[in-house]
């Protein structure tokens, strides 16, 4: 299943119709019908994707206990970067996770704690036994988000390497972003063929990953094809290339998320995406293929998180314009989620 924008087809029809409408009306009618069918198919694909995301969203019921709808771990946060793990963690809670744990460096912990009393903060990431400390919590977690605010300190990266190995051994889904992607670019074997991994690179991060695993030059005119090829080169893991359109591939198909956002790009909105995706991938895997109509649960989760992030951006921009920040976007999570995915 793929969703394609129909803007290109519309432009072609607009250019040709002026030349042929008067003299070749049958051809004009054919072109108009082609555009109509293209638009109808794109709209149907979009509606199907929205429904698949709605299918994985758990019902709110008094029969559940705390933790069932998501216990998410965020791995990141160092002296320089404390906002990113907070953004990812609080976004996970706003989307609907019950509990969020942040595993960060000791110096980052008091700052992150001060941002929100709702996050459970573990100041262990720069300790000599960081892997063992995080391993103790892994059986309680449904998904990990690795990379927000991580930085590139050798000790932290080495500890995260061990955490990723332990995560794979326990078959826990993992979303990798930011400097977690830098680590993967240095050692692609860390996540190669791990089908519960999702990478969320921006353009620069995507190019770095491409250079690390593919010898051929990247075709900047075929971003969908490039996303597909990078996923295949990494063993068909899910890749989300963020950009003007978000392109999502598991090496077999490509989904396109072109939900309206805004022209404002503020630092931290990728953390909103990764935190949201951590929750949604848990929901999608728990729901299973029967709820995703045979589609990859990870693809459905990724498309849902991308769509939500773009809608938060749109809503915040309508209110704040150029001054929009990620904090403003996070405030919109509840209304955006209801607008998109609540029936």
UniProtKB/Swiss-Prot annotation:
PANTHER family named among the record's database cross-references: ATP-DEPENDENT (S)-NAD(P)H-HYDRATE DEHYDRATASE, ATP-DEPENDENT (S)-NAD(P)H-HYDRATE DEHYDRATASE FAMILY MEMBER
Main subcellular location: mitochondrion
Domain YjeF C-terminal: 49-340
Phosphoserine PTM positions: 216
GO terms of biological process kind: nicotinamide nucleotide metabolic process
Residues that bind (6S)-NADPHX: 149, 202-208, 271
Entry similarity comment: Belongs to the NnrD/CARKD family.
Statement: the UniProt record of this protein carries the keyword NADP: yes
Catalytic reaction(s) noted: (6S)-NADHX + ATP = ADP + phosphate + NADH + H(+); (6S)-NADPHX + ATP = ADP + phosphate + NADPH + H(+)
Keyword Acetylation found: yes
Gene name tied to this protein: Naxd
Name listed for the protein in its UniProt record: ATP-dependent (S)-NAD(P)H-hydrate dehydratase
EC number(s) reported in the record: 4.2.1.93
Cofactor: Mg(2+)
InterPro entries xref list: CARKD, Ribokinase-like
PTM sites of type Phosphotyrosine: 81
Molecular function as annotated in GO: ATP binding; ATP-dependent NAD(P)H-hydrate dehydratase activity
Keywords, sorted A to Z: Acetylation, ATP-binding, Lyase, Mitochondrion, NAD, NADP, Nucleotide-binding, Phosphoprotein, Transit peptide
Gene Ontology cellular-component terms listed: cytosol; endoplasmic reticulum; mitochondrion
UniProt xrefs under PROSITE patterns: YJEF_C_3 (PS51383)
Subcellular location: Mitochondrion
Transit peptide: 1-42
